[in-house]
Amino acid sequence: MTTYSFTEKKRIRKNFSKRPTVLETPYLLSMQIDSYNDFLQQHVPMQSRAKKGLQEAFESIFPIKSHNEMVELQFVGYEFGKPEFDVRECQLRGVTYAAPLRVRMRLAIYDKNSTKKKLKQVVESESVYMGDIPLMTDDGTFVINGTERVIVSQLHRSPGVFFGDDDGQGHSSGKKLYNARIIPYRGSWLDLEFDVKDLIYCRIDRRRKLLITILLRALGLSNQEMLDIFFSKQTFKLNKTGKIELVFEPEQFAGELAQFDIIADGEVIVPMGRKISSRFVRQLIEKKVKKQTVPVDFVVGKFLATDLVDKETGELILAANSELTEELLTRFVELGVKEFQTLLINENGHGGYLADTLRLDETTTELEARAEIYRMMRPGEPPTKEAADSLFEGLFFDEARYDLSRVGRMKFNRSLGREESEGSGILSKEDIIGVVKKLIAIKDGFGSTDDIDHLGNRRIRSVGEMAENAFRIGLVRLERTVKERLAQAESEGLTPKDLINVKPVGAAVKEFFSSSQLSQFMDQNNPLSEVTHKRRISALGPGGLTRERAGFEVRDVHPTHYGRLCPIETPEGPNIGLINSLAVYARTNEYGFLETPYRKVIDGKVTDEIEYLSAIDESKYVIAQANAHLDEHGAFMDGLISTRFENEFTLMPSSRVQYMDVSPRQIVSVAASLIPFLEHDDANRALMGSNMQRQAVPTLRADKPLVGTGMERVVAMDSGVLVKAARGGVIDSVDSSRIVVKVNDDEVQAGGLGVDIYNLTKYTRSNQNTCINQKPLVSPGDIVARGDVLADGPSTDMGELALGQNVLVAFMPWNGYNYEDSILISERVSQEDRFTTIHIEELTCIARDTKLGPEEISSDIPNVKESALAKLDTTGIVYVGAEVKFGDILVGKVTPKGERSQSPEEKLLRAIFGEKASDVKDSSLRVPTGMDGTVVDVRVYTRDGIEKDERAKAIEKMEIDSIAKDIKDQLRIFSADIHDRAARLLLGQAIKKAPKRKSGDTVDQALLDETTPEQWFDFRMQDEAINEKLDAMKQLLEDKHKELQDYYEEKKAKFSQGDDLAPGVLKMVKVYLAVKRRLQPGDKMAGRHGNKGVVSLVVPVEDMPYMEDGTPVDIVLNPLGVPSRMNIGQVLELHLGWAAAGLGKRLAQMMDEGAPIKELRRYLDAVYNHNPACKKEDLDALSDEDFWQLCRNLRQGIPMATPVFDGAEEVEDLQKMLELAELPATGQTHLYDGRTGERFDREVSVGYMYMLKLHHLVDDKMHARSTGPYSLVTQQPLGGRAQFGGQRFGEMEVWALQAYGASYTLQEMLTVKSDDVDGRTKMYKNIVDGNLKIEPGLPESFNVLTKEIRALGIDIGLTQD
């Protein structure tokens, strides 16, 4: 049986999904919230915090020791204070929402005189303040300086070791040069690379390259050790006659050409010149061939593997790695050498690269090698042994400067084929040798290079990790200053507080949150854009890629993106592919790699057991698609199944499948999963569709989509714009700005308040100037459960995301007005305010302290008519509710003017009338051009120490009254609850003492009615246990009263204190204007399928094409916009939308005709459960009252959900719905011309489509100017709307006039109409005087030209006759 929540049962969305939901959509913001919680560990006790986030940052820096190591500052733990203001207050005051961080430290001082380290004293610290740490709001944002910001997660290259090649680009020969790179989380990069001559080099931090053997030698390896580690050996025996025998190991020769006859038992097994195949090798092993006589040519040219030493004299005959010649072999015979070893080097997987490199290496000792590295890192400085050693040790072997991190070590060990995933954060000798070995193996053809775009090699760095890095930088800066001060700590008796300077830590954190590239101004256009912004993954930013350098491969969709990053949603333009969106079900694992859920398949049966796999693990398994056909037991019905294995799509037998996708929408992001019939749209248009949904402006009346995907509710619930019940209960009271809930008894903690008050956000400005407004959905007496929706926010309708409006659309041309994607709309759409939006503009007026005196905000403004001041109050600030237009004064402000010498008459007037108009000028805040609206809010901020004006006091009183009202309601409900419990306790009890009653009487209702509830607590019963309970209740009531009173006083004190304003600012007034914008020509609109266009004309309703029943269409779109764009989803949406509205219309008709409830239930059951394969809706679970309410809400249309890749089928669903709605199954009908009444020739596709109005409004773009500002240098008009610019007659326009020889026009354009300053003022004068003469002068641009030529050192001047 289906259970519906309070809001779900009011409007049930019919779902066409044929597959059961195995895994609910996870909380969409969990990545941000979990990451930051891990960083703070705010609610974890100090002793039990894990080593991550802040804790790890502190532990990595502390203890800080003095230079002589006799004093050390140790870290004990940290805790957070209470934030000074809550989120809303921070937004209003323009401050950061943060909590003070306090750290407990201890100072340990050791005894200098004792030989062993002996503690002399310990200075325990009370907590030390370490700056404010911004807190995350419940919705995953930060409030920084009053504005909401989001920290976008970064996709960066995982630390570890990577093997690659240059793809033949590095050298003109086109030879592939292999390389390896060890990337730490923190520290120097180490690159190993081959050059064209097959020598191996290394680079540290991309500097000059050195031979790899220098690095190996600096690690302490000798020549002999290097050869032993990297090469196999061949042993040769010499007899006195000079015959050479090879100790034969057949495996060493596999795949080579035999350079001599290989003989066994007197027969030739492999003749010279034949390839030694694996068959021959097997034969030789079977025959146990142990030695072969080889010709001298075979040995000549080989390299000695070990030093050859004369055993008698101890003299070195030949050093290892020397080439053997015939002369040397003869000498060996003479010296009686019986045996020598050579390096096994051949073309067949045993390259001699390292030996070649070693021969070029001129260093011989470890010290020389380290000195060479020192010279490379610090050119120009003479290397000493100490300096060289300390630099080399610090590069890769010092934990303070080098850290591979847990991820890096895991990736490193995996890459080298080691079993364990844990290990040290620094490199070891074995690590570097292992990397060189693998690089040589790859060069020899064993093993492959890494794909750096594979999501197993890129990881997510979330908010918490980035904040930790910023904090660590601050701590490192702090460490330097502490180290210097520690020496004085003992002698001067300093405490930890004296040692620590908070500034560097606070500055580092503040810099990260306010100016990092990844700390972005939140996109608050609508709820979807907020959610998407928090789920965005960027490859840009510090330590990431740059737009210019990123190539095509990085931006492209990779097979590992499946279920992790959305292949559709990414911006168009220079950032394409660099900014991605998290897929619906994706999450990060402990190492920061993205993982996606799969259902486990056991013995060919799909189970409901969910396992998350990262890209590293996924390639090992065979994974079936979510649309594979299963029987009722979960077994695959088809023999061959479409699967993914090793990043390839293949068909596999069902017995080999190990996992199966969780859901068809697994691969897309939240925005793409909101597009119905996405599977029928071309990818490019789907990309535009998902991006444009984020630009939809919340309309005045939100309208749920008739055709959705079922994700609308999930997005709205997780976005944070709705008000959800924290605890279940009964609605006590509701008005437009707050909801009071009396909480269920079983959800109230002992002694807790049984009341929740939700203050709604009313007409508040968002970051994008759209309007945030919440409207209640509940009525007094409603019963709600935890998590139910109490109030809708912007762009939500009954708890579902509603970005646009359902409008009746026809696809047909109409007089060329829908040419090139133009959109023709009916006047009705505009009249009914379907796409009317409210925008809130913030205008600020600042009164500063100037040199000539303070600026003043007042209504006493010089030279201003009375009528202009009509909308201002006595303090000079506009009233809330005033309707203002361009040029109106919002805040009256006067600024002192410089004193000028006054004439005797002025002095006399001033002496008589005290006239002060002359020494101040009007600098009021006025409504800017092209704006008109209603004042919805005014905020006054006053500096501390300056008296607040009347308006500021009135605003303060309003805020305090609102808090008082909340507290009064909380007390009322709490008291009523306690009194109710007291009454139940007292009734029927034997009295010991009570007014007007004798001892022994029982308490009855009459007694309770005669006395006040406060008196009940003074009654005494004969049962002492009851008296104790009464006393406890009385105490609880008093405690709660005091607690709420204290809270009220605290809030009151906050409001009455002054504001923290910028230096020199005395007062600041912010005025908020609500601007109503109707849909008009020039506005951009779009559907959800990337079908965008601009409104071209608003046509009267009577002229619009209409249907046979007389219904005029709302919008006419061009049919030519569909075939070439290949977004057929919009046509299917049109048909299903028509069916949905038609079904609603039929239901409304039945209700109006008074059909019995049984018939309505039967009809709706036929609609909701028409296809047994689809999700079943249990309408019988609804009571009659709930059912009637559902019917009333479905009159406008029955909302449908067609989930992506699992939606409505054309024949069995779409046509069935159209038939049920009694509409043509083709989805087309005849239309009539509204102007002539004639029928159009052929049928037209008509239906309901969900259209959005985008944030590109014509009002923000259109702009006109007569006169305005000019550029100072050229005296030509400025450009652009923001500067109130105009048209400039530029060089190309001049060429056009020159081409026509229009010399007089040209002269006029270049002089009096443009930048001839004197000429244009004279011309104005002449026009006023009626004298129509032009006197052209010298254009200012000419002066600019002469100045520029003079700057080149050429003296140029204009001689005038």
From Swiss-Prot:
It comes from the Bacteria. It catalyses: RNA(n) + a ribonucleoside 5'-triphosphate = RNA(n+1) + diphosphate. The keyword Nucleotidyltransferase applies. Keywords: DNA-directed RNA polymerase, Nucleotidyltransferase, Transcription, Transferase. The keyword Ribosomal protein does not apply. One of its GO terms (biological process) is DNA-templated transcription. Its EC number is 2.7.7.6. One of its GO terms (molecular function) is DNA binding. DNA-dependent RNA polymerase catalyzes the transcription of DNA into RNA using the four ribonucleoside triphosphates as substrates. The RNAP catalytic core consists of 2 alpha, 1 beta, 1 beta' and 1 omega subunit. When a sigma factor is associated with the core the holoenzyme is formed, which can initiate transcription. Belongs to the RNA polymerase beta chain family. This is DNA-directed RNA polymerase subunit beta. It comes from Dichelobacter nodosus (strain VCS1703A).
